[in-house]
Design a protein with these regions (language model features):
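Transmembrane alpha-helices and adjacent helix-loop boundaries
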Residues: 1-249
Length: 249
């Protein structure tokens, strides 16, 4: 592939990850979140700290940032799951704003101006673009495959039942809350991976860009247009969204 094609495709892979993980949470778990930008931002800032401060290689730092975001989602879920329906959705947005404010105030995170990634210094542009491209491609494939395997498992059958009727699923012995927490944590980890890819692609992060609610708008559009509650829906939606963005840009 040409360098120009790689540059464009990296965004597509990040969109596939975001759409697939949001669909897992909303399309199967029945959890409509409008605050996943909390973990996109955390993943973006996390990968820079892990690469520049800790010294991890970029691919390892990206994966580690996703794991950190999944870990952050566990305690956060115990707060959010006290809310239901629209209150849950608004609660996730509040959490995202809290993440943003905390990031701005923490020392060493650049305040309102953000941080720059220095781990790629000395690496030529073509190599950097190719590295991020193949990393994004690999992660997008792994996320889709992991979602497919999950939905073919016992947990996936329970999630399908929850999607159709959570009350009936609970009456049949499905652990509704535990299953929902699982997909929330998984989706947050996926958002962290996408945020880390966005950060290493742009080489810079700031609170306003990384914690922007536009990412949630992108995810909702991708899933709705592609097909909510299907494996292939987010992929189709991401391709349509990406094509429209390229044509209208």
């Amino acid at each position: 592939l040409s360098t120009r094609a790689m540059l464009a495709s990296k965004l597509l892979f990040a969109l596939i990850i975001l759409g697939t993980t949001w669909n897992l949470m909303a399309g199967y778990g029945g959890l409509v979140s409008i605050g996943q930008q909390a973990y996109i931002g955390a993943g973006g800032y996390g990968v820079i700290k892990l690469a520049d401060v800790v010294g991890l290689p970029i691919p390892v730092a990206v994966v580690a940032a996703g794991v950190v975001c999944a870990a952050l989602a566990i305690p956060t879920s115990f707060l959010l799951f006290r809310l239901v329906g629209g209150y849950f959705a608004i609660g996730t947005w509040v959490v995202a704003e809290v993440f943003k404010l905390v990031t701005q105030e923490l020392p060493g995170f650049g305040g309102g101006s953000g941080l720059s990634l220095t781990a790629f210094q000395g690496v030529d542009r073509v190599t950097r673009i190719a590295t991020v491209y193949y990393l994004a491609l690999a992660l997008a494939v792994l996320v889709v495959l992991a979602t497919y395997v999950l939905m073919r498992s016992r947990v996936g059958l329970g999630l399908t039942a929850i999607r159709d009727d959570s009350v009936a699923a609970a009456s049949l012995g499905v652990a509704v809350r535990r299953s929902q927490r699982l997909v929330y944590v998984a989706a947050s980890g996926g958002a962290g991976l996408a945020g880390a890819l966005i950060a290493v692609n742009g080489l810079r992060v700031s609170p306003d860009s990384m914690f922007s609610v536009q990412y949630t708008a992108f995810m909702i559009f991708i899933v709705v247009i592609g097909g909510l509650g299907t494996i292939e829906g987010p992929i189709l939606g991401a391709v349509i969204f990406f094509a429209l963005q390229q044509l209208l840009d």
